[in-house]
């Protein structure tokens, strides 16, 4: 009786030992699996945050461009581009200006005023040419305004070079108002469609990248859940 009981106890002990070994292996596998899932979840969370941050930054860039560049582009009336013939170019007078010489320091100077008149081919009307839209806002009497500086002779030399370039090229493209409300033409548009495209290109790429990152993470999570459900069904 004693011998039979001892054998049974030994067999039971071996069975329990094997079961403990299998349980430890299974627990170890589950622990590794949980660590892997936790690491993947942390990486997915970081990827989603990156995608959302990219989308928020692109929206902010869209907003800034909308209130600055896009607004000026929509308000511009000089939309018709055509060849214009030079009628007259001359330096008429000088105007006072001020420039910064340091913190809380301003000095007065002068700049020469260059006037350029062109011929409107369709009607033969004489129009004043401006370098850009900002030139007309600064001084409506001048076609080209050099940067205000301490050296007046340097400004005069720069304006003389611009004047000679106009005389050398008698025909050049300009932008005019097709409705005829503005009696002036623009040589260079600061807010053209090409500038608008290049300004909106990078925010659009950032937005597309953020959306793609979030979509890829969500797709990966969906496929992972789908595979897990299939494995449970097969079991």
Swiss-Prot record:
Transmembrane segments: 47-67, 195-215
Keyword Transmembrane: yes
Disulfide bonds: none
Superkingdom of the organism of origin: Eukaryota
Extracellular topological segments: 68-194
Gene Ontology molecular function terms on file: calcium-activated potassium channel activity; potassium channel activity; potassium channel regulator activity
Principal cellular location given in the protein's record: membrane
Any one of the GO BP annotations: detection of calcium ion
Pfam family, one: KcnmB2_inactiv
Signal peptide location: none
Keywords from the UniProt entry: Glycoprotein, Ion channel, Ion transport, Membrane, Transmembrane, Transmembrane helix, Transport
InterPro entries to which the protein is assigned, alphabetical: K_chnl_Ca-activ_BK_bsu, KCNMB2_ball/chain_dom_sf, KCNMB2_ball_chain_dom
Glycosylated residue positions: 88, 96, 119
Tissue spec: Highly expressed in brain and heart. Also expressed in lung.
Region (Ball and chain): 1-45
GO cellular component, one term: plasma membrane
Domain notes per entry: The ball and chain domain mediates the inactivation of KCNMA1. It occludes the conduction pathway of KCNMA1 channels, and comprises the pore-blocking ball domain (residues 1-17) and the chain domain (residues 20-45) linking it to the transmembrane segment. The ball domain is made up of a flexible N-terminus anchored at a well ordered loop-helix motif. The chain domain consists of a 4-turn helix with an unfolded linker at its C-terminus.
Complexes and interactors: Interacts with KCNMA1 tetramer. There are probably 4 molecules of KCMNB2 per KCNMA1 tetramer.
Name of this protein: Calcium-activated potassium channel subunit beta-2
Source organism per UniProt: Rattus norvegicus (Rat)
